[in-house]
Amino acid sequence: IAAKTAAKNNLNTVLIDDKNILGGTTLFQENECFKINNSYSNEWLKKEIETLKSLENLTIKTRTSLAAYHSYNYLLARENLTDHLDINEKKDKIRQRLWKIRAKKVIIATGAMERPLIFNNNDRPGIILSSSIKKYIDYYGVKCGQKVSLFTNNDSAYETAISLNNSGVNVNSVIDIRDKTNSLIVKQAEKLGIKIHWKSSVVNTSGYKRINSIEIMKLSDDGTAVVGKKIKEECDCLGISGGWTPRVHLFTQSGGKLKFRDEDNVFLPDKSGLDQISIGSCNGDFELDQVIKNSVSSTNKFLKVNNNDYENLEIITSKEIDKKNIWLLPSDKPLGKTKPFLDFQNDSTANDIKLALREGFKSIEHVKRYTTTGMATDQGKLSNMHALGIIAETAGVKMGELGTTTFRPPYTPLTFGAIVGRNVGEFFDITRRTPIHDWHVENKAEFENVGQWKRAWYYPIDNENMHEAVQRESKAARDSAGILDASTLGKIDIQGSDASEFLNRVYTNAWSKLEIGKCRYGLMLNEDGMVYDDGVTTRLSENHYLMTTTTGGAANVLSKLEDYLQTEWPELDVYLTSVTDHYGTVSICGPNSKKILSKVIPDLDL
C-alpha cells in the first residue's frame, strides 16, 4: 500500500522484501475469515502486486533484507543472489550484493515475529513455531508431521490448524491457555471438527530423536498452576504460538525510542528524529482491517498526498477477542525439576533468569550477559520478550519500566564478501610526484612506490642492473658528491608561542635551546614506548619550526599531533599545517657538497 501510494504520486520508490515473492503471510491467507471486497484476501493482494509491478518509478528488490539503518536515513540492504540456486548453478557467481541507500523518506513495514511458548521440555525436535508449520504447508506443500498438535495463547494457531486440515494432515487438537472465545477463526476450526482444549497447558513432552507425545493439564483460574488429571496425546509435531512481537529492530537502530503497550505486552515505535514512519504490525496493528486503514492514513499524512484507492474496501476479518500472556507456563513439577528453554540456541532457561535475579542482577543487560539469553545468532528475536516478562513478574515491576536490550546491526547476517565488494583487480589510486620528477625521468631513473609517491630509486647507465648502479652511485657520493630527492618526506609547519614545549613533549629529546637556523634529529614514541616516527626538525624562528617525518608516516603523525593538541594539551598555543606538497627537498652529501652548494647559493654562509 505504501509503495503504491508513493510511486503513483511520482516519488522514486524502492520496495524491499526479504522473500522471493511479495505479499508476506497474506499471500496464502485463503480463508473465509479474511476477505476484501468479497474476495479472499490473498486474491485481492495478488491484483495489488500486479499493479505494483507496472509502476515505472518503483524498483522492487526481492530476496533482499535491510541489514542496518543508520543516521540520516542511510540504509544497508543485503541482496541474496544465489542462495536459492542449485549448487552447480551458483558456481563462480556472486552470493550477495550490498546496496547502500540514502533515502529522503523511509516507511518501515517489517511486520511482526511469532513468539514461542515457554514450558517444560519445549526444545525437543519436532516442536516448531505455528507460523512456520503454516508456511511450510502453504508455500512449499511440505508437511511437518502427520499427527500435529498446536499449543497457543492466540488465534494465529487456528489458521495453521485449518491449513493443515485442508491439506489432509491430522490435527490432534489445539491446546489454548485462554478461556473459550468465539472469534470467526475459532468457530471455523470447530466446524471442521478440530478438538480444542480450552484453559489448558502442555506440561511435558516426550520423545528421543523427535517428539512423540505431549502431556496436557488444565490451568487454574489465575493461570499460575495446573490442576486435574493429565491427558497424554500422541503427536509427531507440536506447533507453538505465543503471540506476536513487532519487529522494531530497524527503527531502534536508526535512533528511535520505543513505548510499551500494556494491553498485549508489546514495544512499539514512538519518537524518531529521522524522516520515517512505521506501519502495519511492526507498529502494533495486527488485525487485517487495522493494517489497511492505518497504513493508508499514515502513509498519506507522511507523504502529504491523498490516495483514496482504499476508501471503500469491504473487509471481513477474524477479530481476536481475548489475548492472554503467561510468560512461564506452570508445570506439575517444581521449578528446579523442569527444563523450560528460553533461548533455543544458547540453551538458557527460565530457571537461569530466576537464578540471575536471586544473584542480584536487576538490569536486563546484566541478566542477558549472565545467562547468555539473547546472545545467540538470532540476537534474542525469540527469547527477549519472554525474558523481560519473567524478570518483570519475578521482580514485581512493569515490563515497560525494564526497557529492552540494545538492537544492534546487522539485523540479518552479512557475508564479509558482500561488505568488501567485488574483486576488480587493481583499484585507482592517486600518484604523487616530487617537484623535480621530470628531471628524474630525463636522467632515466627507476622509481619505487613509497606510499602514493614515486621516488627515484637508482639511475642505471647502459645495461647496468640495480646492484651495479647503486655501487657506482655510492662511490660517487663518497668520492665527490651525491644528491637525494627527499621531497617525499612529510613536512609539518609548527607555529605558536608553545611550539618548543610541544616538541619537548612529543619527541624524546629537548628542543627549547635549539638555535634559530639549526636542525635536530628527533625520535617520536607512541604511548607504549615503541618508536612511532623519526625525522629532522628545523627551527626557523623563535616560535616557528619545520618538522619532517617519514614518507609513509606523514598523515598518521599529523593526525596524532592534532589529537594531542585537541584532547591532551588543549591549553598549548600551537598551530599545525601540512606543507609536504609546498616544498621540494634535496639532500646533498659527499666531500664536494659545500663547493656545489656555494655555487648554487653564493651568498650562503657555510
Regions found by a protein language model. Give the residues of each.
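Residues forming the flavin
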Residues: I1-R433, H582
